[in-house]
């Protein structure tokens, strides 16, 4: 069966449940997705990340080791992680063990390991991660690009924290974050596998009964800078790491998403055959790869891309990126490029829906972005029927893509 979305009524809230039944393998997986509770909800840099990590430390009664042993003994996976917009708790188990999995999830939600030992453990882990990132020049270039594109906004912040912000986070900060952001009224359940609709409704109500009501906020739109800034960050490196981005004045709710899909594919999303790859690698040999994509989210839409090149050719590569985008916006694409995009995007569709996890992820995105289930299939039809004139009209209307900013990690 294909995925469905149903509402489970609980108190004053209709909890959306994205669901696909599959008895091919006797496994059940469930995601609890809490909206407006990811990195953008941080009151201190890294707070959402540490809050998720703390839920990986078991309960205060059992501690991390004993709780992990309970999970292992029953072959249950239970973890938490954060994205920009959401906080997610995932649980999966064999069907025969899923009741046990739900019981352990209940223990975790009712008794998180709010102890100083657990806090110090997750702080050590995060500080170690941040120390490693000091020599990850892709990370540094990406962070600097976000600072440029989203100046003075939550998107410009270091999501994973800084050593100073991580040290400043207290148990009380984490308690407040979890209690204010993990509620029944900002919950979306995504589930699939060998589980009936009735069982899923019962589990959803059980989980909801463990959660408070929280204040649900709408994500604010963030303006993307069009100032065409170039920032150089000097490090001990033999390569230049070039990250670039520009505004893309386009809503995630727009009805003609297929045009953006084709645009992205031809400009820099397709690897070999894309404009960027052809000009930077194939014709000039300046880099092993050059890519870009059009990112669309509830808070911002923008172009972002990256490449690596020799220090001596960084300015040439930067200039080519600008010229490729300028020419692309001015002239659009060719009939051959359009056909190549159609062939790949339509022809590779089976690979994007072959697993239950892929199908559930797609169904969740269709629901979350208000596109309706089945939107992706309709988009494929729109791609097949797209004309060269309408795609080029779309490309030429987005002159803001030329307002490119660069963050370049280069040698001292």
Residue ranges with predicted function:
Residues 10-11, 23-26, 181-183, 235-237, ...:
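Extracellular/periplasmic catalytic domains that process cell-envelope and extracellular macromolecules
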Residues 31-92, 271-286:
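M16/MPP (pitrilysin/insulinase) zinc-metallopeptidase core fold and M16-derived inactive scaffolds
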Residues 2-27:
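N- or domain-start disorder-to-order transition segments that initiate the globular core
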Residues 22-25, 31-36, 216-273:
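His/Glu-based metal-binding/catalytic segments typifying zinc-dependent metallopeptidases
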Residues 69-215, 283-284, 289-412:
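Charge-rich, well-structured scaffold segments of protease-associated domains
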Residues 41-44, 99-101, 253-256, 314-317:
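Solvent-exposed, non-transmembrane alpha-helical starts
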Residues 16-21, 176-179, 228-234, 394-395:
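Short, surface-exposed beta-strand/loop micro-motifs that present aromatic residues
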């Amino acid at each position: 069966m294909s995925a469905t979305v149903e509402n489970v009524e609980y108190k004053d809230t209709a909890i959306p449940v994205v669901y696909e039944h599959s008895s091919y393998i006797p496994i059940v997986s469930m995601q609890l997705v809490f909206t407006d509770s990811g990195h953008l909800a941080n009151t201190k840099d890294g707070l959402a990340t540490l809050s998720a990590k703390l839920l990986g430390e078991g309960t205060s009664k059992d501690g991390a080791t004993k709780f992990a042993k309970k999970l292992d003994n029953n072959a249950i996976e239970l973890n938490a992680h954060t994205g920009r917009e959401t906080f997610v708790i995932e649980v999966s188990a064999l069907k025969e063990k899923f009741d046990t999995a739900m019981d352990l999830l209940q223990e975790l939600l009712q008794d998180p390991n709010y102890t100083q030992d657990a806090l110090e453990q997750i702080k050590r882990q995060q500080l170690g991660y941040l120390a490693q990132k000091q020599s990850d020049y892709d990370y540094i270039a990406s962070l600097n690009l976000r600072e440029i594109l989203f100046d003075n906004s939550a998107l410009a912040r270091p999501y994973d924290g800084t050593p100073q912000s991580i040290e400043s986070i207290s148990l009380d900060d984490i308690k407040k974050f979890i209690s204010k952001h993990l509620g029944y009224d900002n919950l979306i359940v995504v589930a699939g596998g060998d589980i009936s609709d009735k069982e899923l409704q019962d589990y959803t109500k059980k989980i909801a009964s463990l959660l408070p009501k929280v204040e649900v906020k709408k994500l604010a739109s963030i303006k993307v800078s069009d100032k065409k800034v170039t920032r150089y960050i000097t490090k001990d490196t033999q390569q230049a790491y070039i990250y670039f981005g520009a505004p893309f004045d386009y809503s995630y709710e727009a009805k003609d998403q297929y045009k953006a899909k084709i645009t992205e594919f031809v400009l820099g999303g397709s690897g070999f055959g894309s404009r960027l790859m052809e000009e930077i690698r194939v014709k000039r040999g300046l880099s092993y790869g050059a890519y870009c994509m059009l990112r669309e989210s509830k808070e911002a839409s923008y172009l972002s891309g990256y490449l690596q090149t020799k220090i001596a050719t960084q300015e040439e590569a930067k200039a080519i990126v600008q010229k490729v985008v300028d020419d692309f916006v001015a002239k659009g694409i060719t009939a051959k490029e359009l056909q190549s995009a159609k062939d790949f995007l339509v022809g590779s569709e089976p690979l994007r829906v072959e697993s239950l996890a892929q199908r559930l992820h797609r169904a969740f995105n269709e629901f979350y972005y208000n596109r309706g289930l089945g939107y992706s299939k309709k988009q494929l039809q729109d791609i097949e029927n797209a004309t060269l004139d309408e795609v080029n009209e779309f490309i030429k209307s987005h002159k803001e893509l030329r307002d490119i900013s660069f963050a370049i990690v280069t040698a001292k």
